[in-house]
């Protein structure tokens, strides 16, 4: 038995939390797995002719300003979707490279290398939300990529994956494996050394049309960081009064407001040590940015609250909002929501 993919982490609880959040937004998705190291300018064999996905990991991991929207929104010009003729299983059906466990650095090698890992990038069925998740290879306890191509794509039913992860205990170790003799299944293993337990699931993989998204990098005026429990509470409290929430930011304050049957509601939050922090990324510190968003989606985003202590928001006039959470020590998830039209 040879595994073309083998990863293991003790951060299993964080993976369950983020999978639960993604399950509320996507029914299924393609997970792209990259080698431990990615060389700058490296292209896959035949795939590079059809898509730019081989550079997805490197470009997206450094891009905090990506955004998405559906085709009917005002921000449609900032994302274009391409559908390839490949599917996830076809992409996996090939011989493993048994010598590419973890690329060895050659003496005198000058090519710049970046850390690879796992990428999920999908727009949900409403067309209003882009989900982007990145898990870094060097943050896993074990990350072995033995596939002969530069990318391995697996189509995974998110609901079925969540069912497996819900069987874990808090301190379980989670492993994902793909056997070269049974490449149509993802093996999920949950282990507890203390209880001497081992639970193994073999998930059927899906044929999902592979989609790529061209996302224009955008500079947002403000990077807004606040405690993730606070953001969850503001959204939850607002939900009792309104269906849509307006988020407005200045260089010093953050405002949440809405209208409903009870009337108008507004929360004003100022900067504090250990609390709200607003960083201006432009020379114009007097700029006011705001956007109107559907609260039900922001509430789904807050399912990620327990992943980290702080959440970061990127806000710009007439643009989608980006809500970013760190996935424990593994990576990050960016949830991008298109603005809503006023009633």
Region locations from a protein language model:
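DNA polymerase sliding clamps and clamp-related checkpoint/processivity subunits
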Residues: 1-241, 246-343
């Amino acid at each position: 038995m040879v595994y073309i993919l083998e990863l293991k982490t003790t951060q299993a609880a964080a993976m369950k939390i983020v999978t639960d959040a993604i399950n509320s937004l996507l029914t299924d998705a393609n997970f792209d797995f990259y080698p431990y190291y990615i060389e700058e300018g490296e292209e896959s064999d035949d795939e590079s002719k059809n898509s730019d996905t081989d550079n997805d990991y490197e470009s997206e991991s450094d891009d905090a300003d990506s955004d998405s929207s559906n085709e009917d929104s005002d921000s449609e010009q900032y994302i274009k979707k391409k559908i390839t003729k490949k599917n996830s299983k076809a992409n996996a059906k090939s011989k493993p490279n048994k010598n590419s466990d973890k690329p060895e650095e050659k003496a005198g090698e000058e090519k710049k290398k970046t850390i690879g890992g796992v990428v999920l990038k999908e727009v949900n069925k409403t067309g209003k939300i882009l989900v982007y998740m990145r898990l870094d290879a060097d943050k896993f306890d074990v990350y072995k990529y033995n596939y002969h191509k530069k990318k391995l794509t697996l189509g995974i039913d998110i609901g079925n994956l969540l069912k497996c992860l819900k069987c874990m205990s808090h301190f379980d170790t989670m492993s994902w494996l793909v056997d070269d003799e049974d490449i149509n299944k993802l093996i999920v293993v949950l282990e507890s050394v203390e209880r001497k337990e081992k639970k193994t699931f073999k998930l059927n993989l899906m044929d999902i049309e592979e989609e790529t998204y061209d996302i224009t990098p955008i500079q947002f005026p403000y990077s807004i960081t606040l405690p993730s429990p606070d953001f969850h509470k503001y959204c939850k409290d607002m939900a009792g009064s309104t269906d849509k929430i307006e988020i407005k930011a200045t260089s010093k304050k953050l405002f949440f407001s809405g209208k409903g049957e009870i009337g108008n509601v507004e929360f004003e939050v100022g900067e504090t040590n250990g609390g709200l922090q607003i960083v201006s990324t432009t020379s114009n510190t007097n700029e006011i940015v705001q956007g109107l968003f559907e609260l039900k989606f922001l509430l789904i985003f807050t399912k990620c609250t327990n992943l980290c202590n702080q959440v970061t928001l990127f806000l710009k006039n007439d643009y989608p909002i980006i809500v970013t959470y760190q996935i424990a020590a593994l990576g990050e998830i960016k949830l991008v929501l298109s603005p809503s039209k006023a009633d």
